[in-house]
């Protein structure tokens, strides 16, 4: 069927900010879909609140609205644009829920907007647990016994009839939010209560637990002519019971018989046909390992995390084709862009194995609950491709960037047998490493399979890896054993360890004996047809398929998996850098390991290497491609950390040189540079042990800010008030980087701001200054940033511009740099300099219309700012006000404290733009799901050093009609200054404490600060947790509360008697 001509204008809803459960895979899907629709000649209107994505670039759609994805704003845009149709299946759960809301409020009918891709009835059938159950019964597809409940009592009654364990699944939530496994009534009551609150329709499904079954997923496509196919099947290494987003996954599935595969394939295709989905869909099934029994677990009637993985694993571009199907094209009319010759109706065939391992945030959240269950906790993931399980698994392990280069964590050797087995049975994020350690200790695959329900097939592979380790240990320098190890994915580093030599020597031995990897193409058809995709993975074998071209090339290193502190912003910069390299006439080569992102879409670069970002793997590509040089500025700390070893190996680093990177990152060299340039910084010293740190702090005076050098996202950074706290920090936190010292700085409480600058070595372009709303002490990634600055004097802005120019030229910066300043009493101090692209690049690029990463890349490749038409100095300000606000994923992470400080905790960001500060703030708060009603109750629980300031806020809240509640000490302070606040009880005073008020819905906002001492106040933590769990806006910085008040004041009317 040809494409539809009765629709011209299509609106696409994006997925909003990155949170756990909804990450960069939707940026990738949305970008593909918008371009795909434009290619077919439709006018595309995009709504998305996330500035950090490629998707919200001007070129991606005809009109891009970076506005909150709320009923109010989306309706406004629909009325203004009047599209013929809406495509909601590419914006994750956010997009689907928005479509449902628009429909239920009658907006779609009123404006005559048609839903494309998935009909509302199908969204309802897949997402509403009751309708889903009915549909499965009609199709005679087995599902676990279950009951829909709307109250806790109903749940308890049903569980009593089927017996424990049971699983709770809230309706219409993302990434299993609010769900979980319950072994008894107490757990069931707790989880159901929370799940009902988090479900927008207060509905949960209670079902019999089938934990221990194999979890299998099918990624399927269907078109309007009822053609349907399986793109890819995938098998979870972890059995049912752990969220698939937190599971290690292999594609294609490895342990099913042909009969089982056909059975589950038929089930998946019959489900997508029954739902009449036009586009992509993901079906999750549970298979009994001991019989042919299976159950359908759930269906996602949209593009999902698994479809991004399936696209990258097969090369089959699901989102791109889903968009074409949505406008009426059929699978037998669309050419598969990978081969360029076969139609999309061909099912992909794989002649390799793909492994995906999730990346968790627990290196940042040491207190977080690491046990895995049905609620997702990973922030990102890595993927690796190999010719066997061992190879793809070990490549994926070293892609994780958690300090491992093999499937082992050396520290586990010291763990007792009992502790080890407990971790093997009770899965945490690092279970793979515990299971591998158990095998090294002689536990058999059979014993471990019994304990974990992991298939023996995979455990045998882990045993095989261990056997190769033993072979290597017994035969140092043996070439045959070396070949075997390389065929099975071993790194040079691991081999060197077992041989008692260095990585370099192993590399030399390999090169002398021509033991080098070949690169194979990902072509969707197992090499049956000729293919034109330049998408490669390494393996040790025969016939290299990646042929070096005659054109000069430039290699760009990506940023690896998404984690807190290094998010999709770096992928954004990578993609823009590639565009500039191509525009300059070079061949652009990308190397990255993250399946969710736009940079690993094979159509972005001239060549894509899907490989771990380690020195060995990068050098292998360089040896083959011989590029003009490597760009490391855009891949965050991942790429910067590779600069020095690459330069030592004789590789040309393009842009700022390694010695100059060192001057910005090494404390003593940086201090010296600032002295020479006559730029003030807070007084500080370096310390390599506890005594030195104590001495330094006494000299500088408390409070001090302590942190390791060379880290990203404020890892292990703290503000300490006294020597005792400092000593305990030195004992517990300094593991962060053993061969780098700790920095001890005077902590200046002032106004913080940051600048991104671009330099060609002679001139410096400063696109803009961003002012932080929260004062110094809150990590820049967790602060709200305002552009242009609202409170900085002209003099301060001129000083900042002057210091920025001096630093860029003085540090020989070529390309991008980011500088953070703190201002106190009109004096400007430099806090830190990062000689690379930072996380503010996408935001600042969008609000100034300067494609910063592209400009920086052109300068790196030899052009000057004046040739590109840019002046030296500060770029003219925009007239609108733009705000970048952080978004957190605390609902997903039990036991993580939501108190903000110098260590970064946010997972994503949104942007609000308007003519005034108040309007822009309103949009930013709405987009980040912080909705405050115009009246209600606010509770204050404030540390002594901030009571004075809080009093002023409380008065303003009272003026606009809010009721004021406060904890005992705060209420007494308010009363002594003439403000009566209703006192609330201490934690544990039943019915009178803050958590119980929160549960009853009597509190609309909580303002909670702790002293600079920041001791773990358990009461405060419980209060903050209750706010997170019940979705009550929580402010742990008074500056943020002040910003929210500005919004409320601008929206409220004053009523006064005459």
From Swiss-Prot:
Mg(2+) 2 binds at residues 298, 300. Pfam families: CPSase_L_D2 (PF02786), CPSase_L_D3 (PF02787), MGS (PF02142). Its EC number is 6.3.4.16, 6.3.5.5. Gene3D superfamilies: 3.40.50.20, ATP-grasp fold, A domain, ATP-grasp fold, B domain, Carbamoyl-phosphate synthetase, large subunit oligomerisation domain, Methylglyoxal synthase-like domain. Residues 133-327, 671-861 form the ATP-grasp domain. GO terms for biological process: 'de novo' UMP biosynthetic process; glutamine metabolic process; L-arginine biosynthetic process. Residues 930-1058 form the MGS-like domain. Mn(2+) 3 binds at residues 820, 832. Keywords: Amino-acid biosynthesis, Arginine biosynthesis, ATP-binding, Ligase, Magnesium, Manganese, Metal-binding, Nucleotide-binding, Pyrimidine biosynthesis, Repeat. Mn(2+) 2 binds at residues 298, 300. Mn(2+) 1 binds at residues 284, 298. ATP 1 binds at residues 129, 169, 175-176, 208, 210, 215, 241-243, 284, 298. Mg(2+) 3 binds at residues 820, 832. It catalyses: hydrogencarbonate + L-glutamine + 2 ATP + H2O = carbamoyl phosphate + L-glutamate + 2 ADP + phosphate + 2 H(+). Its cofactor is Mg(2+); Mn(2+). The large subunit is composed of 2 ATP-grasp domains that are involved in binding the 2 ATP molecules needed for carbamoyl phosphate synthesis. The N-terminal ATP-grasp domain (referred to as the carboxyphosphate synthetic component) catalyzes the ATP-dependent phosphorylation of hydrogencarbonate to carboxyphosphate and the subsequent nucleophilic attack by ammonia to form a carbamate intermediate. Large subunit of the glutamine-dependent carbamoyl phosphate synthetase (CPSase). CPSase catalyzes the formation of carbamoyl phosphate from the ammonia moiety of glutamine, carbonate, and phosphate donated by ATP, constituting the first step of 2 biosynthetic pathways, one leading to arginine and/or urea and the other to pyrimidine nucleotides. Belongs to the CarB family. PANTHER family: CARBAMOYL-PHOSPHATE SYNTHASE [AMMONIA], MITOCHONDRIAL, CARBAMOYLTRANSFERASE FAMILY MEMBER. Composed of two chains; the small (or glutamine) chain promotes the hydrolysis of glutamine to ammonia, which is used by the large (or ammonia) chain to synthesize carbamoyl phosphate. Tetramer of heterodimers (alpha,beta)4. This is Carbamoyl phosphate synthase large chain.
């Amino acid at each position: 069927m040809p494409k539809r001509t009765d629709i011209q204008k299509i609106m696409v809803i994006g997925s909003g900010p990155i949170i756990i459960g909804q990450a960069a895979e939707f940026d990738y899907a949305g970008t593909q879909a918008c371009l795909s629709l434009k290619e077919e000649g439709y006018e595309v209107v995009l709504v998305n609140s996330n500035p950090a994505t490629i998707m919200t670039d001007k070129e991606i759609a005809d009109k891009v609205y970076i506005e909150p994805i709320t009923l109010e704003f989306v309706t406004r845009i629909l009325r203004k644009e009047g599209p013929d149709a809406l495509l909601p299946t590419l914006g994750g759960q956010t997009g689907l829920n928005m479509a449902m809301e628009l429909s239920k409020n009658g907006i779609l009918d009123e404006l005559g907007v048609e839903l494309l891709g998935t009909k509302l009835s199908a969204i309802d059938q897949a997402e509403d647990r009751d309708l889903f159950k009915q549909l499965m019964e009609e199709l005679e597809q087995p599902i676990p016994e279950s009951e829909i409940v709307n109250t806790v009592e109903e749940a308890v009654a049903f569980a009593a009839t089927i017996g424990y364990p049971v699983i709770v699944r809230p309706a219409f939530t993302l990434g299993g939010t609010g769900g979980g496994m319950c072994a008894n009534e107490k757990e069931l009551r707790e989880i159901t209560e929370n799940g009902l609150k988090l479900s927008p329709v207060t509905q949960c499904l209670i079902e019999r637990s089938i934990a221990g079954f194999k979890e299998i997923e099918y990624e399927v496509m269907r078109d309007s002519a009822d053609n349907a196919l399986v793109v890819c099947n995938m098998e979870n290494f972890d059995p049912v019971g752990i969220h698939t987003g937190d599971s290690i996954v292999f594609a294609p599935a490895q342990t099913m018989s042909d009969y089982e595969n056909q059975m589950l394939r038929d089930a998946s295709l019959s489900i997508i046909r029954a739902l009449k989905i036009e586009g992509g869909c993901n079906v999750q099934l549970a298979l009994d390992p001991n019989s042919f029994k299976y159950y359908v677990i759930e269906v996602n009637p949209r593009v999902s995390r698994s479809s991004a993985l399936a696209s990258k694993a097969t090369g089959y571009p699901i989102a791109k084709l889903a968009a074409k199907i949505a406008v009426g094209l059929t699978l037998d009319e669309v050419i598969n862009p990978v081969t360029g010759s076969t139609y999309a109706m061909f099912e992909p065939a794989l002649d390799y194995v793909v492994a995906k391992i999730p990346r968790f945030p627990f290196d940042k959240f040491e207190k977080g609950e690491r046990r895995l269950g049905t609620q997702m906790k990973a922030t990102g993931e890595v993927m690796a491709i190999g010719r066997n399980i061992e190879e793809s698994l070990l490549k994926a392990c070293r892609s994780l960037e958690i300090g491992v280069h093999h499937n082992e964590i050396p520290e586990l050797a010291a763990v007792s047998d009992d502790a080890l087995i407990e971790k093997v049975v009770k899965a945490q994020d690092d279970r793979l490493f515990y299971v591998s350690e158990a095998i090294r200790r002689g536990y058999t695959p059979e014993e471990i399979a019994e304990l974990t329900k992991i298939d023996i097939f995979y455990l045998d592979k882990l045993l095989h890896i261990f056997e190769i380790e033993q072979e290597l240990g017994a035969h140092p320098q043996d070439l045959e054993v070396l070949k075997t190890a390389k065929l099975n994915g071993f790194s040079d580093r691991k081999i060197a360890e077992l041989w008692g030599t260095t990585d370099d020597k192993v590399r030399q031995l390999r090169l002398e004996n021509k033991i080098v990897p070949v690169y194979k193409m990902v072509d969707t058809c197992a090499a049956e047809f000729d293919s034109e995709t330049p998408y490669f993975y390494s393996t040790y074998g025969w016939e290299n398929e990646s042929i070096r071209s005659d054109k000069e090339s430039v290699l760009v290193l990506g940023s690896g998996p998404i984690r807190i502190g290094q998010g999709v912003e770096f992928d954004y910069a990578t993609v823009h850098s590639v565009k500039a390299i191509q525009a300059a006439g070079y061949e652009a080569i990308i190397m990255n390991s993250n399946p969710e992102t736009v940079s690993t879409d094979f159509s972005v670069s001239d060549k894509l290497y899907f490989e771990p970002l380690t020195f060995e793997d990068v050098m292998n590509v360089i040896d083959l491609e011989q590029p003009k040089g490597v760009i490391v500025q855009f891949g965050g700390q991942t790429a910067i950390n590779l600069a020095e070893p690459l330069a030592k190996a004789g590789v040309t680093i393009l842009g700022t040189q390694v010695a100059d990177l060192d001057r910005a990152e090494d404390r003593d060299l940086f201090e010296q540079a600032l002295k020479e340039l006559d730029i003030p910084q807070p007084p500080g010293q370096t310390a390599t042990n506890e005594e030195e740190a104590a001495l330094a702090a006494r000299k500088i005076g408390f409070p001090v800010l302590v942190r390791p050098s060379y880290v990203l996202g404020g890892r292990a950074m703290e503000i300490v008030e006294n020597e005792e706290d400092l000593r305990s920090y030195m004992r517990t936190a300094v593991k962060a980087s053993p061969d780098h010292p700790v920095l001890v700085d005077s902590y200046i409480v002032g106004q913080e701001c940051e600048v991104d600058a671009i330099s060609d070595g002679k001139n410096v372009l400063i696109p803009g200054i961003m002012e932080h709303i929260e004062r110094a002490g809150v990590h820049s990634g967790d602060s709200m940033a305002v552009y242009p600055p609202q409170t900085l004097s002209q003099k301060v802005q001129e000083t900042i511009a002057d210091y920025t120019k001096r630093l860029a030229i003085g540090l020989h910066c070529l390309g991008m740099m980011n500088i953070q300043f703190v201002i106190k009493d009109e004096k400007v101090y430099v806090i830190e300099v990062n000689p690379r692209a930072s996380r503010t690049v996408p935001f600042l690029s969008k609000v100034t219309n300067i494609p910063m990463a592209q400009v920086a890349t052109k300068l790196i490749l030899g052009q000057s700012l004046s040739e590109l038409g840019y002046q030296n100095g500060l770029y003219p300000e925009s007239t609108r006000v733009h705000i970048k606000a952080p978004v957190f994923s605390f609902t997903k992470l039990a036991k993580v404290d939501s108190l903000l400080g110098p260590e970064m905790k946010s997972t994503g960001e949104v942007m609000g733009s308007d003519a005034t500060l108040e309007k822009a703030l309103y949009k930013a708060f709405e987009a980040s799901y912080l909705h405050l009603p115009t009246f209600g109750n606010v509770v204050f629980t404030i540390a002594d050093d901030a009571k004075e300031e809080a009093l002023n806020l409380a008065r303003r809240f009272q003026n606009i009609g809010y009721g004021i509640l406060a904890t005992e000490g705060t209420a007494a302070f308010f009363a002594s200054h003439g403000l009566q606040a209703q006192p609330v009880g201490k934690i544990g005073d039943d019915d009178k404490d803050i958590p119980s008020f929160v549960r009853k819905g009597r509190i609309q906002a909580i303002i909670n600060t702790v002293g600079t001492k920041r001791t773990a106040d358990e009461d405060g933590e419980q209060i903050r947790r209750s706010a997170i769990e019940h979705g009550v806006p929580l402010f742990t910085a008074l500056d943020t509360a002040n910003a929210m008040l500005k919004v409320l004041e601008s929206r409220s009317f004053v009523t006064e008697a005459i």
